[in-house]
Amino acid sequence: EAISNMFPDRQKDFVLSINETDLVLIKELTGPADSNKEVYEIAEEIEKKLHDDLNLKCVIGIGTTAKHLRVLADKYKEAQVAIEVGKVFDTEKSIIHYDNLGIGRLIYQLPTTLCEMFLSEVFKKNPIEALDQETLYTINKFFENNLNVSETSRKLFVHRNTLVYRLEKIKKLTGLDLREFDHAIIFKVALMVKKYLNSQNGEY
């Protein structure tokens, strides 16, 4: 009801209750069809309303704009996919747009057998499980800092040579040199694939 009251124009906006926890909002947009700004503002208002009035946390999935009524079902599916993919790859985000899912959307659509095959091909020398938490943390920081050794070592509060040593250790274990762009991409995708497989097995 709190959400329905935010959209009083029943001719243009529709709030549908799917079950006890899920709602669908079909909203007429006034701005350009390809602009996500208006959509994000609406989503933020809904999130704030639920938090302030009902002390509820929510996750909002946004589909792409429907230019015709006949494609509404497809847009609803997109919003659902945005939520599902977001649960795996963007756990910190509460508002997820289908357009911004990136490579996560592609991985989500792959059969698990193909994902497992990819991991075994990438990690021929040692399985990904051979990497300890500190090493994985280092790798993620290295990616966050665009493969910049100096910047990453500064953020990790370690000497540059310490980071280089860790990267060499990763290279020995996996055969991948993360300082090389192509190797870094393969490793990044592999980490995402592993995350996806864990989610399918109920491990987050």
Model-identified regions with their sequence ranges:
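Cytosolic nucleotide-utilizing catalytic cores of signal-transduction proteins
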Residues: 1-204
